[in-house]
Amino acid sequence: MAHLTQFEKRRQRVRTALRQRAAGRPRLSVHRSGRHIYAQLIDDAAGTTLAAASTLDKDVRGKTGATTAAAADVGKRLAAAAKKAGVTQVVFDRGGFLFHGRIKALADAAREGGLEF
């Protein structure tokens, strides 16, 4: 890619720093769109997804996914799924998004749910 946008440059910086700090821990990857928010725990060594949650899940689907309350709900659901999978320590991958608003709400709820990062 000859011309990277500011977002793409930031995403590369974040991912490079995560690889250096991961130390074998799974990555909590977050993606935010205008309507929804998605989060998943990824084991990069094995290349598998350990747990996932989003505002498109059946239990949450009727509500809007573009609020901090919905993001917090996704964080709680992901933390519960991570506990079920036996994961407590993760590396938070904000993926180029600023740590503010819905991203911060999801992270705080995941921490309250028992994930450490």
UniProtKB/Swiss-Prot annotation:
**TM helices/strands, residue ranges:** none
Q: Source gene?
A: rplR
User: What GO MF annotations does this protein's record show?
Assistant: 5S rRNA binding; structural constituent of ribosome
**Which Pfam families does the record cross-reference, listed alphabetically?**
Ribosomal_L18p
What is the documented function of this protein? This is one of the proteins that bind and probably mediate the attachment of the 5S RNA into the large ribosomal subunit, where it forms part of the central protuberance.
- The intrachain disulfides are none
Identify the keywords attached in UniProt to this record, alphabetized. Ribonucleoprotein, Ribosomal protein, RNA-binding, rRNA-binding
Report whether rRNA-binding shows up as a keyword of the record.
Answer: yes
Q: Which family does it belong to?
A: Belongs to the universal ribosomal protein uL18 family.
Q: Which PANTHER family match?
A: 39S RIBOSOMAL PROTEIN L18, MITOCHONDRIAL (PTHR12899), LARGE RIBOSOMAL SUBUNIT PROTEIN UL18M (PTHR12899:SF3)
Record-level GO cellular component terms: cytosolic large ribosomal subunit
What is the name attached to this protein's record? Large ribosomal subunit protein uL18
Q: How does it assemble?
A: Part of the 50S ribosomal subunit; part of the 5S rRNA/L5/L18/L25 subcomplex. Contacts the 5S and 23S rRNAs.
A GO biological process held by the record: translation
Q: Which domain of life is it from?
A: Bacteria
